[in-house]
């Protein structure tokens, strides 16, 4: 336990909390332009072709973000909205693209968890 005199000379320093999504700069979402849309393979126990996009944000950052859901209409120069949230089996992917916003359409024929994929409510049969 330090003395009061020691604390006067050298005060306690609180730990700096590192952001998990630094490119957002404390904003909930950020807009950006796709520079490359491609597929990549996940880490060891899993196997798939995951859809990702390299996005240049309005604040100058260039990040890799994940395109969730089945099928998408993204290509180079598409304007997208990104949010935080990493993909555990894709190293370096720390952001998600918001479905149904700006140039990215919602998932077609989606019935459950629609709000997460930008899908409108289906017409009652």
Curated annotation (Swiss-Prot):
Self-association state and partner proteins as the record states: Part of the 30S ribosomal subunit. Contacts proteins S8 and S17. May interact with IF1 in the 30S initiation complex.
GO molecular function: rRNA binding; structural constituent of ribosome; tRNA binding
CDD domains in UniProt: Ribosomal_S12
GO cellular component terms, A-Z: small ribosomal subunit
Listed GO biological process terms: translation
Modification 3-methylthioaspartic acid, positions: 89
Keywords, ordered alphabetically: Methylation, Ribonucleoprotein, Ribosomal protein, RNA-binding, rRNA-binding, tRNA-binding
Coiled-coil intervals, chain numbering: none
Name recorded for this polypeptide: Small ribosomal subunit protein uS12
Source organism, top-level taxon: Bacteria
Known function: With S4 and S5 plays an important role in translational accuracy. Interacts with and stabilizes bases of the 16S rRNA that are involved in tRNA selection in the A site and with the mRNA backbone. Located at the interface of the 30S and 50S subunits, it traverses the body of the 30S subunit contacting proteins on the other side and probably holding the rRNA structure together. The combined cluster of proteins S8, S12 and S17 appears to hold together the shoulder and platform of the 30S subunit.
Database matches in InterPro entries: NA-bd_OB-fold, Ribosomal_uS12, Ribosomal_uS12_bac
Pfam family, one: Ribosom_S12_S23
Family the UniProt entry places it in: Belongs to the universal ribosomal protein uS12 family.
Organism listed in the record: Cupriavidus metallidurans (strain ATCC 43123 / DSM 2839 / NBRC 102507 / CH34) (Ralstonia metallidurans)
């Amino acid at each position: 336990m330090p003395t009061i005199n020691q604390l006067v000379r050298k005060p306690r320093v609180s730990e700096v909390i590192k952001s998990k999504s630094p490119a957002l700069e404390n904003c909930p979402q950020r807009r950006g332009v796709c520079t490359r849309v491609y597929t990549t393979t996940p880490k060891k126990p899993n196997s798939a072709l995951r859809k990702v996009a390299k996005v240049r944000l309005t604040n100058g950052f260039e990040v890799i973000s994940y395109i969730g859901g089945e099928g998408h209409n993204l290509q180079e120069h598409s304007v997208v909205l990104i949010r935080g949230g990493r993909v555990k089996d894709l190293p370096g992917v720390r952001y998600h693209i918001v479905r149904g916003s700006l140039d990215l359409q919602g998932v077609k024929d989606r019935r459950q968890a629609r709000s997460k994929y930008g899908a409108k409510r289906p017409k009652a049969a």
